[in-house]
Amino acid sequence: MDPENKKSATGAAAILDLDPDFEPQSRPRSCTWPLPRPDLATEPHEPSEVEPSLGQKVPTEGHSEPILLPSRLPEPAGGPQPGILGAVTGPRKGGSRRNAWGNQSYAELISQAIESAPEKRLTLAQIYEWMVRTVPYFKDKGDSNSSAGWKNSIRHNLSLHSKFIKVHNEATGKSSWWMLNPDGGKGGKAPRRRAASMDSSSKLLRGRSKGPKKKPSVLPAPPEGATPRSPLGHFAKWSSSPCPRNREEADVWTTFRPRSSSNASTVSTRLSPMRPESEVLAEEEMPASASSYAGGVPPTLSEDLELLDGLNLASPHSLLSRSGLSGFSLQHPGLAGPLHSYGASLFGPIDGSLSAGEGCFSSSQSLEALLTSDTPPPPADVLMTQVDPILSQAPTLLLLGGMPSSSKLGTGVSLCPTPLEGPGPSNLVPNLSVMAPPPVMAGAPIPKVLGTPVLASPTEDSSHDRMPQDLDLDMYMENLECDMDNIISDLMDGEGLDFNFEPDP
């Protein structure tokens, strides 16, 4: 920097520092910078020269010191001043200029290019060529390095504006023609073509049909009080069961008869995955009072009872051997003492022996009589137990056990939760529910219990009213007489039903 300019910059900085109370001057809103003040000049001069318009030059004499105005101050050595930097760059351009090449947009330039063609159509390369040849701004930007930006903008405008249409070029190896829309098109941009075509595109429909068909790992639980009417509800409850069923087979299950809606019709000796005990306790709880049992027999229980129709059970004496299955124990409600659990048997043995006349069913009332009877059997003669679950995809195992009429339960009934406690595989079983209704509930229905509560009598009557020592499910399965063709044809077509009459090793 020469000494004269350096001196001028120093003087301008000093003048600005000496006037700390500089207040903005009133000016029209269209003016960006304030008009120069006369007191900032270094020497007297005419007012007409002091207050020039923003785009005019200040006349100066060759022998005199140049007039220092805020719009003409050189840049100080300490850094650019905000008000000085904008004025040094040159006069302010007109506000009507929208782009670097003028006031016309890309779409207007493209329209001019197409209209200038004899056939009123141009290819994309011809539009590029017209831009470089006609518009001065693009004359030096025709090479590949400097033309990437504006050529990309032209392609966007051709695609997004409805005033341009693309016509197929019949010549081999030629790009398509771009023409002006004869209908005029809209002034603004057309909606994106991809978004407009997605709704009616067959490609989208194919994409939807090819979506993942895996069953959800966590299925919503049915609302409280809802009763499942088909095995599909149980399958949703036990989503991790080995049987490969999912929601897509709902239409298959709806055509079956009502008796197939119970899980007891699925015969298998394999244990299914079971839910944690906390989930069972939270979802299904025993009502606190016996008055809530008023009404008829629950529909689900009726369907479960229908399922046992036609099944001939083995002799009670053949069911006393030890079972190879694991995980359950049972205690008669009338017995005192701790609840025993054994990992190697289905029902834990009870001290003492059964008399020859005692078995799973009473001699006075057979299973067929219980099932075909219109009225519910006397509560004192029926013992219902429920295991949740024991069969594959069958959370319900319904057993009807006869109790001698001499074993009369007391009128006082207490609810006592008795969760199963046992080592080994028995921990997989959440709960075993035993219900023996007292005579006072003879008119009440028999509810379906899935939780832990047990209706037990406070009276400890008789040492001979006990359950069988063990119930061998393998023996039960081997001696089961049923119409296998009927079960297979009703339940499924050979996929998930696992009939295995061989005892597990």
From Swiss-Prot:
GO biological process: insulin receptor signaling pathway; mitotic G2 DNA damage checkpoint signaling; muscle organ development; negative regulation of angiogenesis; negative regulation of cell population proliferation; negative regulation of G0 to G1 transition; negative regulation of smooth muscle cell differentiation; positive regulation of DNA-templated transcription
Required for interaction with FOXK1: region residues: 97-215
UniProt-listed PROSITE patterns: FORK_HEAD_2, FORK_HEAD_3
InterPro entries, sorted: FH_FOXO4, Fork_head_dom, FOXO-TAD, TF_fork_head_CS_2, WH-like_DNA-bd_sf, WH_DNA-bd_sf
This protein's GO CC annotations: cytosol; nuclear speck; nucleoplasm; nucleus
Gene3D superfamilies in alphabetical order: Winged helix-like DNA-binding domain superfamily/Winged helix DNA-binding domain
Pfam families associated with the record: Forkhead (PF00250), FOXO-TAD (PF16676)
Post-translational modification note: Acetylation by CREBBP/CBP is induced by oxidative stress and inhibits transcriptional activity. Deacetylation by SIRT1 is NAD-dependent and stimulates transcriptional activity. Phosphorylation by PKB/AKT1 inhibits transcriptional activity and is responsible for cytoplasmic localization. May be phosphorylated at multiple sites by NLK.
Induction notes from the record: By artery ligation in proliferating neointimal smooth muscle cells.
Gene Ontology MF terms in the entry: beta-catenin binding; DNA binding; DNA-binding transcription activator activity, RNA polymerase II-specific; DNA-binding transcription factor activity; DNA-binding transcription factor binding; enzyme binding; identical protein binding; promoter-specific chromatin binding
Polar residues bias spans: 257-271
Expression sites by tissue: Strongly expressed in brown adipose tissue and weakly in white adipose tissue (at protein level). Expressed in skeletal muscle.
Region called Disordered, residue ranges: 1-66, 175-244, 257-276
Localization (cell): Cytoplasm; Nucleus
SUBUNIT field: Interacts with CREBBP/CBP, MYOCD, SIRT1, SRF and YWHAZ. Acetylated by CREBBP/CBP and deacetylated by SIRT1. Binding of YWHAZ inhibits DNA-binding. Interacts with USP7; the interaction is enhanced in presence of hydrogen peroxide and occurs independently of TP53. Interacts with NLK, and this inhibits monoubiquitination and transcriptional activity. Interacts with FOXK1; the interaction inhibits MEF2C transactivation activity.
Described purpose of this protein according to its UniProt entry: Transcription factor involved in the regulation of the insulin signaling pathway. Binds to insulin-response elements (IREs) and can activate transcription of IGFBP1. Down-regulates expression of HIF1A and suppresses hypoxia-induced transcriptional activation of HIF1A-modulated genes. Also involved in negative regulation of the cell cycle. Involved in increased proteasome activity in embryonic stem cells (ESCs) by activating expression of PSMD11 in ESCs, leading to enhanced assembly of the 26S proteasome, followed by higher proteasome activity.
Name of the protein: Forkhead box protein O4
Lineage: Eukaryota, Metazoa, Chordata, Craniata, Vertebrata
Gene: Foxo4
